[in-house]
Swiss-Prot record:
Taxonomic lineage of the native organism: Bacteria, Thermotogati, Deinococcota, Deinococci, Deinococcales
Keyword Cytoplasm: yes
Subcellular location: Cytoplasm
UVR domain location: 194-229
Keywords of this entry: Cytoplasm, DNA damage, DNA excision, DNA repair, Excision nuclease, SOS response
Function text: The UvrABC repair system catalyzes the recognition and processing of DNA lesions. UvrC both incises the 5' and 3' sides of the lesion. The N-terminal half is responsible for the 3' incision and the C-terminal half is responsible for the 5' incision.
Origin species: Deinococcus radiodurans (strain ATCC 13939 / DSM 20539 / JCM 16871 / CCUG 27074 / LMG 4051 / NBRC 15346 / NCIMB 9279 / VKM B-1422 / R1)
Record's protein name: UvrABC system protein C
Record's keyword annotation contains Iron: no
C-alpha cells in the first residue's frame, strides 16, 4: 500500500486497521491517527512489512485515549491479526485489577484468577495501561502498598503525606470515604466518567464554600486530569453483556455516510460502513432505511437489538421481517437516554468523521463533490474546474489592498494567487476597490498570463457583486459570478436565471436573488473554503504593508499617550485591529497604562473609525 492511497485521517484518537484481502493484518491505536499511521510508512522492520502487504486501511474515531485502548483490545482479540504477533495470546495481555480486600488497591497483572477481584482488560498496550494506573494512583487516594500490616505502622508513608492515600495502614482511612474512592475508580474503568466528574465538581464547590481552598485545588486538579484522559464517557462497551448493532449516519448534500458497529458480549468487535451518493433532498431516516435494507438482507447473524440514530417509517416492518428470519425477536429502536445513547453518539461521531474523510479524499483526487454541486446550484454549463476568489482588506483607510486566489479541481493553486494595491482612493470604498481589482485582472498583464476562470467568487454582498459585474462589462469579459455574504453565508446570484443567464446574453445584469444553502451542502463548503483563503490572503498582505511603521504613526496621534506607553502598546498589540477590538480592561492591563488612559485610547479609535466614509448598501 502506498502512502498516497491512504484515506484522509483525522488528528484525533482512534484505532486503525491495515487489511489485506479484507482481513486485518495489523491493528493499532493512536492519540493522533494521522501522525501515528504516517510513522508506519516511514519505519522499517515489521511496520515496513505490513504497510507493503496491506491493500486498504480503515480507522475508527474514539473520544479519547482510553476509549481507543479498549477498542484496540476488543478488535485484536476478535481478529487476531498476523502482525500483532506479541499480543495473540490473552495470557500476555495486561489487565488492571482492583483487589478484593477490605481496602482494595489497583495493580497491573497478566493473570486472571477467580479471587473475587474486579479485572479490567485485557489491554494490548502496556504503556497505556501504566499511564492510566499512574493517573489513578495520583488522583485517587487508594493504598499503594502490596499488603496491609497486621499491626499499625509506626508512621504514615509519603503517599499519605502527599494526600495520595487515605492511610488504611495506620487506621486513618474512613471506610465510607475509601469506599467512594473505590467506586470512582470502578466507574472510570467501566467507562462512566461523567458521574465521577460531576461528584468531584460538587465536592470542589463545597470545599471552596467552606474556605478549604487547598482541598478545592486538589479536587480541581483531579477533575482536570480525569477529563483529559477519560473525557466524559467511554462508549466502547456497556455495563451489561449484551449483543447488539448500533448505527450512526451523517449527510452533506448529495453525500452520506452510515456506519454500523457490532457489539458482542458488551464489547465492540467490528464495524461496517457505506458511503452513499444521491442523498440530496433525502432525510436521515430514508438514508438509514436504505442502509438497513442493503445490509441486513445479506447479514448472516442479526443480534436481538439494533439501535438507530433516527426513527424511520419502515423500522417496524424490518423488525418483523428480521424476527422471522432469526427465529426470535429482533427489535429496532432509537434510544432516548442511558448508555445506549452514548453508543449512538459514538457511531454518529464516526459517521461524521468518515464522511469528511471520504469527501476530502475525493477533493485530493481532483473530484471535489462541491464542483458538481456548484454546477447544479448555479446552473453552470459545466463543472467550475477553475475558481477565482476576490476580497478587499483595509483598516481606517490605510493601505487598501485586494487579494485573488485560484482553486483548480477544488484545490488551492498558491502559485497563481495575486495581490493588488488599490490605486487612487483616499478613503476605503469596498465597491470601487472590487471594481478596480476585477478590471485590472481582466485587462492588464494578467489577462494574457492566466486563463479565464469558470467561476468568480466575490467575498461580499450585493454591492460588491454588482461592482464586479460592472468591471466585467467594462472589460468585455463574460464570466459567471457568485457572491458569498458573511451574514448567514448567503449566496448572492446575478441574473434572472443565475450565472448562466449572463453567459448566454451578456446583457445588462445585476443581483437578482439570494440563496441560503444548508451549511453541510458541498457547494457551500467549496465556496467557504475559497472565501476563507482569499480573506486570509488579503488580510496578510494588508498587515505586511502596514507593518509597525503604520501602527506607530497611528499611535503617535493617541491623546495622553507618551513614548513609554506607545512602546508598551506596540509590544502588546501587534496590529491596530487587535487594539481596536480589545476591551478597555485589556488595554488598561498593559504595563504603564491606566483605566483612564485606556478609555481615552478606545474613544479616540472609535471616533477615528466613525469619521471615515464607508461603502453603503
Amino acid at each position: 500500500m502506498h502512502f498516497d492511497d491512504l484515506p484522509v485521517l483525522p488528528t484525533t484518537p482512534g484505532v486503525y486497521i491495515f487489511r489485506k484481502g479484507g482481513v486485518p493484518i495489523y491493528i493499532g491505536k493512536a492519540n493522533n491517527l494521522r501522525s501515528r499511521v504516517s510513522q508506519h510508512f516511514k519505519a522499517g522492520g515489521k511496520s515496513g512489512k505490513f504497510t507493503k502487504l496491506a491493500e486498504s486501511l480503515e480507522f475508527i474515531s474514539a473520544a479519547n485515549e482510553v476509549e481507543a485502548l479498549v477498542l484496540e483490545a476488543n478488535l485484536i482479540k476478535q481478529h487476531r491479526p498476523h502482525y500483532n504477533v506479541l499480543l495473540k495470546d490473552d495470557k500476555h495481555y495486561p489487565f488492571l485489577k482492583l483487589t478484593n480486600e477490605a481496602y482494595p488497591m489497583l495493580v497491573v497483572t497478566r493473570r486472571v484468577l477467580k479471587d473475587g477481584a474486579n479485572y479490567y482488560g485485557p489491554y494490548p498496550d502496556a504503556s497505556a495501561v501504566r499511564r492510566v494506573k499512574h493517573l489513578i494512583d495520583t488522583m485517587f487516594p487508594l493504598r499503594k502498598n502490596s499488603g496491609l500490616p497486621m499491626q499499625k505502622k509506626p508512621r504514615p508513608c509519603l503517599n499519605y503525606h502527599m494526600g495520595r492515600c487515605l492511610g488504611p495502614c495506620i487506621d486513618a482511612a474512613q471506610p465510607d470515604e475509601y469506599r467512594q474512592a473505590v467506586e470512582d475508580v470502578k466507574a472510570l474503568l467501566e467507562g462512566r466518567a461523567a458521574p465521577v466528574i460531576a461528584r468531584l465538581k460538587e465536592d470542589m464547590k463545597v470545599a471552596a464554600q467552606g474556605q478549604d481552598f487547598e482541598q478545592a485545588a486538589r479536587l480541581r486538579d483531579r477533575v482536570q486530569a480525569v477529563e483529559k484522559l477519560f473525557g466524559t464517557e467511554q462508549h466502547a462497551f456497556v455495563s451489561e453483556e449484551t449483543d447488539l448493532d448500533f448505527l450512526g449516519a451523517a449527510q452533506a448534500g448529495e453525500f452520506a455516510m452510515v456506519q454500523l458497529f457490532r457489539m458482542r458480549g458488551g464489547r465492540v468487535v467490528g464495524r461496517d460502513k457505506r458511503f452513499l451518493t444521491g442523498a440530496d433532498e433525502t432525510g436521515l431516516g430514508e438514508i438509514i432505511g436504505a442502509f438497513v435494507a442493503d445490509y441486513y438482507t445479506q447479514a448472516t447473524h442479526v443480534p436481538p437489538l439494533i439501535l438507530l440514530p433516527a426513527e424511520y417509517e419502515d423500522a417496524a416492518l424490518w423488525s418483523e421481517f428480521l424476527s422471522r428470519q432469526a427465529g426470535r425477536r429482533v427489535e429496532m429502536r432509537t434510544p432516548k437516554r442511558g448508555d445506549k445513547t452514548d453508543l449512538i453518539e459514538m457511531a454518529q461521531r464516526n459517521a461524521a468523521v468518515g464522511l469528511d474523510s471520504e469527501m476530502a479524499l475525493l477533493e485530493r483526487r481532483g473530484d471535489h463533490p462541491g464542483l458538481d454541486a456548484l454546477k447544479d446550484v448555479l446552473a453552470l454549463p459545466e463543472r467550475p474546474w477553475r475558481i477565482e476568489g476576490y476580497d478587499n482588506s483595509n483598516l481606517f483607510g490605510t493601505n487598501i489592498v485586494s487579494g485573488m486566489v485560484v482553486f483548480e479541481g477544488g484545490r488551492s493553486r498558491r502559485g497563481e494567487h495575486r495581490r493588488f494595491k488599490v490605486r487612487g482612493l483616499e478613503h476605503p470604498d469596498d465597491y470601487e476597490s472590487m471594481k478596480q481589482t476585477i478590471y485590472r485582472r481582466f485587462t492588464g498583464s494578467l489577462a494574457d498570463k492566466l486563463p479565464l476562470p469558470d467561476l468568480m467568487l466575490i467575498d461580499g454582498g450585493r454591492g460588491q457583486v454588482n461592482a464586479a459585474l460592472d468591471a466585467l462589462k467594462e472589460a468585455g469579459v463574460q464570466v459567471p459570478v457568485v457572491g458569498l455574504a458573511k451574514r448567514e453565508e448567503r449566496l448572492i446570484l446575478p441574473g434572472r436565471y443565475g450565472a448562466q443567464w449572463w453567459l448566454e446574453t451578456g446583457t445588462e445584469v445585476g443581483v437578482d436573488r439570494e440563496l441560503l444553502l444548508p451549511h453541510t451542502h458541498p457547494a457551500l463548503r467549496m465556496l467557504i473554503g475559497v472565501r476563507d483563503e482569499v480573506h486570509n490572503y488579503a488580510v496578510s498582505y494588508h498587515r505586511k504593508l502596514r507593518g509597525e511603521g503604520m501602527l506607530r504613526s497611528v499611535f503617535d496621534d493617541l491623546p495622553g499617550i507618551g513614548q513609554k506607553r506607545r512602546d508598551a502598546l506596540l509590544e502588546h498589540f501587534t496590529s491596530l485591529e487587535d487594539l481596536a477590538a480589545a476591551p478597555v480592561e485589556h488595554i488598561a492591563a498593559v504595563p504603564g497604562m491606566t483605566l483612564r488612559a485606556a478609555q481615552s485610547v478606545k474613544e479616540f479609535l472609535q471616533a477615528r473609525e466613525a469619521q471615515l466614509p464607508r461603502a453603503g448598501g
